[in-house]
Amino acid sequence: MAEKKKSVSIKKGDTVKVIAGKDKGAEGRVIQVLREEQRVIVEGVNRVKRHTKVVNQGGRAGTTGGIITAEAPIHVSNVMLVEGGGVTRIGFRRDEVTKRRPDGSTYKAERSVRISRKTGKEI
């Protein structure tokens, strides 16, 4: 039996605020969403240092070693979407839209849109 795909309501490019952890209160833009792990990588938040070794690939130029600072993933439960100056929860609404077929005829369809729970507006 196929396993159900995990859903994450935060999308790449969203501005989020960290609500728990060592970077609580920090805001940043989502760089990457790791859906299977239910984690997000936020720009400038949860930065960690990685010590890397010089890798030489048989005479060719390899990677340089040293200490690299990069963002580490944060669980989605520890971030909230920033919208309209404050944080908000995310909801979903089904909107009815009219679509057009290649032959010119139209038909009704539904699409799912993200909404702000605080204002009710589409995100």
Curated annotation (Swiss-Prot):
Organism: Nocardioides sp. (strain ATCC BAA-499 / JS614)
Function summary: One of two assembly initiator proteins, it binds directly to the 5'-end of the 23S rRNA, where it nucleates assembly of the 50S subunit.
Database matches in Gene3D superfamilies: 2.30.30.30
Keyword Amino-acid biosynthesis attributed: no
Keyword Lipid metabolism set for record: no
InterPro entries named among the record's database cross-references: KOW (IPR005824), Rib_uL2_dom2 (IPR014722), Ribosomal_uL24 (IPR003256), Ribosomal_uL24_CS (IPR005825), Ribosomal_uL24_KOW (IPR041988), Translation_prot_SH3-like_sf (IPR008991)
A molecular function GO annotation: structural constituent of ribosome
Family indicated by similarity: Belongs to the universal ribosomal protein uL24 family.
SUPFAM superfamilies cross-referenced by the UniProt entry: Translation proteins SH3-like domain
SMART domains: KOW
Gene expressing this chain: rplX
Identification of the protein by name: Large ribosomal subunit protein uL24
